[in-house]
């Protein structure tokens, strides 16, 4: 059974190009085209695609507004196409907040070294996102009880509500309901309603927290970091696969939403408690020195690395500096980046957690770590912040 795809773009050339690439994969099939967001919303209701590719800037209704409307009427995995500009970065992050799951640069030459690689990447992204459709549309209980809010809980925007809905939907079997904005609030409440085991601190001592992620990472990182207190006791290093022009905008957004400080990492930064350092896109981020005075090195890293930034590079250097004092996490993402770095951390005695399959947008990086027997705990996204705070005694 093929994956049904709706292509949305006001450029006839781009619609044709994307459609040709998608249809070249026998597992995928373009079932419709829309020239603006309003038309896309109507076609979603009519065709019920498995995945949507969406432009951002369009007449009549832009892509961000269309994403919000689609999440109200029929939640569907959406892959955004955007320009690699600062404005494009902000718009893309807005689209992810609205409910889109992933994005790619609109100029294919910006994401791959050759044409075949770009084609394969687009086909793979569409196929991976299709796997989340069943979770986004799974019926939910309509009248859950609501548990008291934690003192560390933070406001949850549309994207985070959707992420919680993915996990809850995968775990419940109830009567079908029509997906409306009210239903999506109910989805989030259902997470709190489910009895959950209490966490216990391991008793280990840490000096650094490290997180690596890719596809689905912007929402996942926002979900976790916005729930950490301003007096978080350790520095945090973040590695998110993201283009160079996006990381500054993403760090600024996280900083505005979080109690901790978040910044795009710079060469020579001294790691400070309560500050999260996001690896800049197109570079490698390494740690050097000693705990308490460790610094960041930002390097080009050469063309041999598949990922820039690369989780393995950052985690490996963290293991050498901090030995057994790192609390590390591998979150949602395609591929296996982070596995070898996490292996080094575990060998040095540090802690490695992984995101569970049900709450991942793409269960690739966490799966690689879990299958290798490296992670000690596999957690749903909505419980990571709680687990962290218990572990560090906050």
UniProtKB/Swiss-Prot annotation:
GO cellular component: cytoplasm
Coiled coil: none
SMART domains: REC
Keyword check for Amino-acid biosynthesis: no
Domain CheB-type methylesterase: 202-394
The keyword Lipid metabolism belongs to this UniProt entry's keyword annotation: no
Domain comment in the entry: Contains a C-terminal catalytic domain, and an N-terminal region which modulates catalytic activity.
Assigned protein family: Belongs to the CheB family.
PANTHER family with a match to the protein in the record: PROTEIN-GLUTAMATE METHYLESTERASE/PROTEIN-GLUTAMINE GLUTAMINASE (PTHR42872), PROTEIN-GLUTAMATE METHYLESTERASE_PROTEIN-GLUTAMINE GLUTAMINASE 1 (PTHR42872:SF3)
UniProt name for this protein: Protein-glutamate methylesterase/protein-glutamine glutaminase 2
């Amino acid at each position: 059974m093929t994956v049904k795809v709706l292509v949305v773009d006001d450029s006839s050339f781009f619609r044709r190009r994307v459609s040709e690439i998608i249809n070249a994969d026998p597992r995928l099939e373009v079932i419709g085209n829309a020239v603006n967001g309003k038309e896309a919303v109507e076609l979603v209701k009519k065709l019920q695609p498995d995945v949507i590719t969406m432009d951002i800037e369009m007449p009549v209704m832009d892509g961000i507004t269309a994403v919000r409307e689609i999440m109200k009427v029929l939640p569907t995995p959406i892959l955004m196409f955007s320009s690699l500009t600062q404005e494009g970065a902000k718009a893309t992050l807005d689209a992810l907040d609205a409910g889109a799951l992933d994005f790619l640069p609109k100029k294919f030459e910006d994401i791959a070294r050759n044409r075949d690689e770009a084609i394969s990447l687009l086909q793979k992204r569409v196929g991976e996102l299709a796997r989340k459709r069943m979770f986004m549309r799974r019926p939910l209980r309509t009248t859950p009880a609501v548990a008291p809010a934690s003192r560390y809980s933070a406001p949850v925007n549309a994207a985070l509500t959707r992420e919680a809905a993915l996990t809850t939907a995968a775990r419940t079997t109830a009567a079908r309901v029509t997906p409306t904005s009210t239903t999506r609030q109910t989805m989030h409440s259902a997470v709190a309603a489910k009895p959950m085991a209490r966490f216990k601190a391991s008793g280990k001592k840490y000096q650094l927290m490290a997180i690596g992620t890719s596809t689905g990472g912007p929402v996942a990182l926002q979900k976790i970091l916005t729930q950490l207190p301003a007096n978080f006791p350790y520095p945090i290093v973040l590695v998110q696969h993201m283009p160079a022009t996006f990381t500054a905008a993403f760090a600024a957004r996280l900083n505005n939403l979080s109690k901790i400080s978040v910044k795009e990492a710079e060469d020579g930064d001294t790691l400070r408690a309560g500050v999260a350092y996001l690896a800049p896109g197109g570079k490698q981020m390494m740690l050097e020195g000693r705990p308490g005075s460790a610094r960041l090195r930002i390097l080009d890293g050469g063309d041999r690395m598949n990922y820039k930034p690369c989780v393995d590079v950052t985690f490996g250097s963290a293991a050498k500096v901090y030995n057994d004092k790192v609390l590390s996490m591998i979150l949602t993402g395609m591929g296996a980046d982070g596995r070898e770095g996490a292996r080094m951390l575990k060998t040095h005695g540090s802690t490695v957690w992984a995101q569970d399959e049900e709450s991942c947008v793409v269960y690739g990086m966490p799966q690689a770590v879990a299958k290798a027997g490296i992670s000690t705990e596999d957690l749903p996204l909505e419980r990571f912040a709680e687990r962290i705070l218990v572990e560090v005694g906050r």
